[in-house]
């Protein structure tokens, strides 16, 4: 009786129920993809077990095993027109919603099913093949293993979820670590050794992780976490790495005491995602935004996204205008307002632990993005190229051919935009001279409407600067 309502809204795992924009679809529901089809498959398998329904068990196993694959791209030239199939790719990327890198959000939900479903159907006629297990291992090692820093999930891989109050990079990182702990003893010997070292290092860097594992359902996970921490034979380390994610238009440069990340977009991937009233000013999150993770582990966790100027994200070169915040659909929530560029030259290359990334950018909007006022326009005459050369202790950022012909609006490049300490008294040094800058206040609405006082301080002949960090070894 209690499962009838669930069965009514989801008679099979291949479709989703009539909620939000889905209510406009034929037959009242839409085809499920990626993490959503895994969630639906988990429901189907659970329904099958509770109702003793072999058809639900079969469909849940079939739908999910057909999704736990390594997605391939037969013709990359078609990505601009067709977008991506949702799921993991050979470079460790996870794509969802056609054009959005989502390893640190939907990718986590995807992998929760990768833990849950095998535990329900293992040892039954509907259990997975060995190939599915190999793919799940690949996601763990090449996806999660290269997308975190000291237990924090990289914000560049979280899509619109960065705008959520409860969606911190620490929270997402802990969810990923729980998944890894549940799977770690089923990995191959080499993968297990790598992930044991990685997990021990991450848990040591996030000492609150083990205590965060509350509830009866986490007893075994907490026990395994403590065993790893107390095992002296496991060396806690994460090797230096330069990782290019070409399918996501992302780069990760991980050294011993810092991680640098670049977030780009192209004709294949979006500038951001504005959806369900979330992330409505995320316009430039993938416009060459750069991240520096160091010993200040609260830098992007402690209210960074709801206080940073959305028009001056670090690393970006933009025309500072309000582009639009989406259009309400039948649900009443704003959707859209995000877009692709018309540029294909976006990507990178790797030599050992060094790497290069490049992005040709423009203000032209390739797809017909919409907001409440109609078709979106940004800065159609803006164009340029950005490059990042990443070495052991040095990052070189270059720009060339940057122009916005015929338009009076300025083009601004933001080198860095750091969260200061609670008193705002971080020491700022220019050419060896300590500078005391005035503290100003503004809200996001004022920034977007250009009514805030954003006048700065000019420095003539500045050759080098240093900003005191929040904690030791966190200066920039």
Regions found by a protein language model. Name each.
Residues 1-164:
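Aromatic-lined, polymer-binding surfaces characteristic
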Residues 110, 117-132, 136-476:
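Extended polysaccharide-engagement surfaces of secreted carbohydrate-active enzymes
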């Amino acid at each position: 009786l209690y499962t009838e309502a669930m069965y009514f809204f989801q008679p099979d795992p291949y479709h989703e129920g009539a909620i939000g924009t889905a209510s406009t679809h034929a037959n009242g529901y839409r085809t499920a993809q990626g993490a959503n089809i895994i969630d639906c498959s988990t429901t189907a398998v659970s329904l099958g077990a509770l109702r003793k329904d072999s058809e639900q068990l079969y469909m849940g196993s079939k739908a999910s095993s057909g999704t736990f694959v390594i997605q391939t791209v037969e013709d990359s030239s078609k990505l601009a027109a067709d977008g991506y199939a949702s799921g993991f790719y050979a470079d460790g990327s996870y794509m969802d919603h056609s054009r959005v890198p989502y390893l640190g959000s939907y990718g986590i939900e995807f992998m929760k099913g990768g833990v849950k479903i095998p535990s329900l159907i293992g040892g039954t006629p509907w259990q997975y093949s060995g190939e599915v297990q190999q793919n799940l291992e690949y996601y763990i090692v090449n996806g999660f293993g290269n997308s975190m820093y000291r237990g924090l999930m990289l914000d560049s891989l979280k899509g619109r979820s960065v705008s959520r109050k409860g969606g911190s990079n620490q929270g997402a990182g802990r969810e990923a670590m729980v998944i890894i702990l549940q799977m770690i003893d089923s990995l191959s010997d080499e993968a297990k050794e790598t992930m044991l070292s990685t997990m021990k290092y991450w848990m040591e860097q996030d000492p609150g992780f083990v205590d965060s594992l509350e509830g009866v359902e986490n007893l075994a996970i907490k026990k395994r976490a403590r065993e790893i921490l107390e095992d002296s034979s496991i060396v806690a380390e994460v090797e230096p790495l330069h990782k290019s994610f070409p399918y996501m238009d992302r780069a990760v440069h991980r050294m011993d005491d810092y991680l640098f990340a670049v977030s780009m977009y192209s004709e294949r991937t979006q500038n951001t995602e504005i959806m369900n009233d979330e992330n409505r000013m995320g316009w430039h999150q993938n416009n060459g935004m750069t991240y520096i993770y160091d010993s200040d582990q609260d830098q992007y966790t402690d209210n960074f996204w709801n206080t940073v100027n959305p028009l001056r994200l670090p690393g970006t070169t933009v025309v500072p205008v309000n582009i639009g915040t989406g259009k309400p659909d039948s649900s009443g929530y704003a959707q859209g307002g995000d877009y692709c560029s018309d540029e294909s030259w976006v990507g990178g290359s790797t030599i050992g632990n060094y790497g290069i990334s490049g992005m040709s950018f423009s203000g032209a909007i390739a797809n017909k993005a919409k907001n409440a006022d109609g078709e979106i326009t940004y800065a159609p005459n803006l164009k340029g190229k950005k490059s990042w050369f990443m070495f052991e202790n040095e990052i070189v950022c270059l720009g060339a051919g940057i122009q916005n012909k015929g338009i009076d609006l300025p083009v601004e490049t933001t080198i860095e935009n750091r969260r200061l300490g609670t008193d705002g008294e971080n020491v700022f040094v220019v050419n060896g001279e300590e500078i005391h800058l005035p503290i100003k206040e503004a809200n996001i609405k004022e920034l977007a409407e250009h009514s805030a006082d954003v006048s700065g301080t000019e420095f003539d002949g500045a050759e080098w600067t240093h900003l005191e960090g929040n904690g030791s070894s966190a200066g920039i």
